[in-house]
Regions:
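Catalytic binding pocket for nucleotide-activated donors in carbohydrate/polymer assembly enzymes
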Residues: 59-64, 72-181
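Nucleotide-sugar donor-binding catalytic core of glycosyltransferases
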Residues: 1-91, 109-118
Length: 181
Protein backbone atom coordinates (compact mmCIF):
# COMPACT_ATOMS: atom_id res chain seq x y z
CA UNK A 1 0.00 0.00 0.00
CA UNK A 2 1.40 3.35 -0.97
CA UNK A 3 0.05 6.82 -1.50
CA UNK A 4 0.49 9.61 -4.00
CA UNK A 5 1.44 13.14 -3.04
CA UNK A 6 -0.67 15.88 -4.58
CA UNK A 7 1.75 18.37 -6.18
CA UNK A 8 -1.04 20.98 -6.35
CA UNK A 9 -1.32 21.37 -2.57
CA UNK A 10 -0.91 25.08 -1.76
CA UNK A 11 2.02 24.50 0.62
CA UNK A 12 3.91 22.73 -2.16
CA UNK A 13 3.23 25.30 -4.88
CA UNK A 14 5.68 27.75 -3.34
CA UNK A 15 8.56 25.28 -3.70
CA UNK A 16 9.37 24.05 -7.21
CA UNK A 17 11.73 21.42 -5.79
CA UNK A 18 8.89 19.87 -3.77
CA UNK A 19 6.64 19.86 -6.83
CA UNK A 20 9.37 18.06 -8.81
CA UNK A 21 10.10 15.62 -5.99
CA UNK A 22 6.44 14.73 -5.50
CA UNK A 23 6.05 14.17 -9.23
CA UNK A 24 9.02 11.79 -9.31
CA UNK A 25 7.80 9.87 -6.25
CA UNK A 26 4.32 9.54 -7.72
CA UNK A 27 5.58 8.38 -11.12
CA UNK A 28 7.86 5.76 -9.56
CA UNK A 29 5.11 4.46 -7.28
CA UNK A 30 2.54 4.16 -10.08
CA UNK A 31 5.02 2.47 -12.41
CA UNK A 32 6.15 0.12 -9.66
CA UNK A 33 2.61 -0.97 -8.78
CA UNK A 34 1.73 -1.49 -12.45
CA UNK A 35 4.81 -3.59 -13.14
CA UNK A 36 4.52 -5.62 -9.94
CA UNK A 37 0.89 -6.42 -10.68
CA UNK A 38 1.78 -7.45 -14.24
CA UNK A 39 4.86 -9.48 -13.28
CA UNK A 40 3.54 -11.16 -10.12
CA UNK A 41 -0.25 -11.24 -10.61
CA UNK A 42 -0.79 -14.12 -8.17
CA UNK A 43 1.70 -12.98 -5.54
CA UNK A 44 1.72 -9.19 -5.41
CA UNK A 45 -0.70 -7.57 -2.99
CA UNK A 46 -0.58 -3.82 -3.23
CA UNK A 47 -1.77 -0.64 -4.81
CA UNK A 48 -2.40 3.04 -4.29
CA UNK A 49 -4.39 4.49 -1.41
CA UNK A 50 -7.55 6.27 -2.55
CA UNK A 51 -7.45 10.07 -2.74
CA UNK A 52 -8.89 12.71 -5.07
CA UNK A 53 -5.46 13.06 -6.69
CA UNK A 54 -5.01 9.30 -7.12
CA UNK A 55 -8.45 9.10 -8.75
CA UNK A 56 -7.26 11.49 -11.47
CA UNK A 57 -3.89 9.80 -12.00
CA UNK A 58 -4.38 6.06 -11.62
CA UNK A 59 -7.93 4.92 -10.88
CA UNK A 60 -6.96 1.40 -11.99
CA UNK A 61 -4.38 1.12 -9.18
CA UNK A 62 -6.54 2.32 -6.27
CA UNK A 63 -7.18 -0.19 -3.52
CA UNK A 64 -10.54 -0.62 -1.84
CA UNK A 65 -10.98 1.20 1.46
CA UNK A 66 -11.13 -2.17 3.23
CA UNK A 67 -7.69 -3.10 1.87
CA UNK A 68 -6.10 -0.05 3.46
CA UNK A 69 -7.39 -0.61 6.99
CA UNK A 70 -4.43 -0.88 9.35
CA UNK A 71 -5.55 -4.27 10.68
CA UNK A 72 -5.84 -5.70 7.15
CA UNK A 73 -2.53 -4.13 6.08
CA UNK A 74 -0.68 -5.58 9.09
CA UNK A 75 -2.19 -9.03 8.55
CA UNK A 76 -1.14 -9.05 4.89
CA UNK A 77 2.31 -7.69 5.68
CA UNK A 78 2.90 -10.32 8.37
CA UNK A 79 1.94 -13.06 5.92
CA UNK A 80 4.11 -11.77 3.07
CA UNK A 81 7.62 -13.08 2.58
CA UNK A 82 8.93 -10.01 0.77
CA UNK A 83 7.97 -6.39 1.48
CA UNK A 84 8.72 -3.43 -0.76
CA UNK A 85 9.63 0.07 0.38
CA UNK A 86 9.93 3.25 -1.63
CA UNK A 87 11.54 6.57 -0.83
CA UNK A 88 9.24 9.22 0.62
CA UNK A 89 9.24 12.98 0.80
CA UNK A 90 12.62 14.62 1.38
CA UNK A 91 14.24 11.25 0.54
CA UNK A 92 12.92 9.78 3.78
CA UNK A 93 12.63 6.11 4.56
CA UNK A 94 9.06 5.29 5.41
CA UNK A 95 8.05 3.92 8.78
CA UNK A 96 6.97 0.79 6.91
CA UNK A 97 10.59 -0.34 6.95
CA UNK A 98 10.46 -0.53 10.76
CA UNK A 99 7.22 -2.52 10.50
CA UNK A 100 8.87 -4.91 8.04
CA UNK A 101 11.84 -5.31 10.38
CA UNK A 102 9.61 -6.00 13.39
CA UNK A 103 7.79 -8.67 11.39
CA UNK A 104 11.06 -10.23 10.23
CA UNK A 105 10.34 -9.79 6.53
CA UNK A 106 12.76 -9.69 3.61
CA UNK A 107 12.89 -6.14 2.25
CA UNK A 108 13.41 -4.70 -1.22
CA UNK A 109 13.85 -0.92 -1.02
CA UNK A 110 15.07 2.09 -2.88
CA UNK A 111 18.49 3.07 -1.47
CA UNK A 112 18.31 4.62 1.97
CA UNK A 113 19.44 8.24 1.99
CA UNK A 114 19.89 8.61 5.73
CA UNK A 115 22.09 6.78 8.19
CA UNK A 116 20.38 4.38 10.55
CA UNK A 117 21.84 3.09 13.83
CA UNK A 118 23.61 -0.21 14.07
CA UNK A 119 24.56 -2.78 11.45
CA UNK A 120 21.79 -2.27 8.89
CA UNK A 121 23.24 -2.87 5.44
CA UNK A 122 22.17 -3.20 1.84
CA UNK A 123 22.66 -6.77 0.68
CA UNK A 124 22.22 -8.12 4.20
CA UNK A 125 19.07 -6.52 5.59
CA UNK A 126 17.55 -5.34 2.32
CA UNK A 127 18.13 -5.40 -1.41
CA UNK A 128 18.07 -2.12 -3.30
CA UNK A 129 16.50 -0.97 -6.54
CA UNK A 130 16.56 2.30 -8.44
CA UNK A 131 13.91 1.46 -11.04
CA UNK A 132 10.75 -0.61 -11.28
CA UNK A 133 12.60 -3.19 -13.38
CA UNK A 134 15.37 -3.28 -10.78
CA UNK A 135 12.80 -3.95 -8.06
CA UNK A 136 11.39 -6.85 -10.06
CA UNK A 137 14.86 -8.31 -10.55
CA UNK A 138 15.59 -8.13 -6.82
CA UNK A 139 12.29 -9.87 -6.05
CA UNK A 140 13.07 -12.56 -8.62
CA UNK A 141 16.47 -13.06 -7.00
CA UNK A 142 14.86 -13.60 -3.61
CA UNK A 143 12.13 -15.88 -4.98
CA UNK A 144 14.80 -18.01 -6.67
CA UNK A 145 16.61 -18.37 -3.33
CA UNK A 146 14.05 -18.99 -0.56
CA UNK A 147 16.85 -19.47 1.96
CA UNK A 148 17.86 -15.83 1.40
CA UNK A 149 14.31 -14.72 2.22
CA UNK A 150 14.44 -16.69 5.47
CA UNK A 151 17.94 -15.50 6.42
CA UNK A 152 17.18 -11.86 5.64
CA UNK A 153 13.98 -12.06 7.65
CA UNK A 154 15.86 -13.51 10.61
CA UNK A 155 18.55 -10.82 10.40
CA UNK A 156 15.88 -8.15 10.20
CA UNK A 157 14.02 -9.40 13.26
CA UNK A 158 17.33 -9.58 15.17
CA UNK A 159 18.15 -6.02 14.06
CA UNK A 160 14.74 -4.83 15.24
CA UNK A 161 15.17 -6.54 18.62
CA UNK A 162 18.61 -4.99 19.13
CA UNK A 163 18.12 -1.51 17.65
CA UNK A 164 14.47 -0.54 17.10
CA UNK A 165 12.43 -2.12 19.87
CA UNK A 166 11.20 0.79 22.03
CA UNK A 167 13.03 -0.36 25.18
CA UNK A 168 16.25 -0.68 23.19
CA UNK A 169 15.88 2.81 21.74
CA UNK A 170 15.48 4.26 25.24
CA UNK A 171 18.39 2.22 26.63
CA UNK A 172 20.71 3.24 23.81
CA UNK A 173 19.68 6.90 24.15
CA UNK A 174 20.44 6.81 27.87
CA UNK A 175 23.80 5.13 27.22
CA UNK A 176 24.60 7.80 24.63
CA UNK A 177 23.58 10.58 27.04
CA UNK A 178 26.03 9.28 29.67
CA UNK A 179 28.81 9.48 27.13
CA UNK A 180 27.89 13.06 26.29
CA UNK A 181 27.51 14.25 29.91
Amino acid sequence: ITRLWDPAEPVVQTDSELVRQRGEINEMRMLLVRKLRATFPEQFIGGIQDSPYAQTQCPDLILSEHSTWKRIYLHRMKHSKICIASTGLHQSSGWKIAEYLAAGRAIVSEPLCYEVPGPFQAGENYLTYTSADGCIEQIRTLLAHPEQILQMGQRNRAYYDEWLRPDQIVTKALEQAKILL
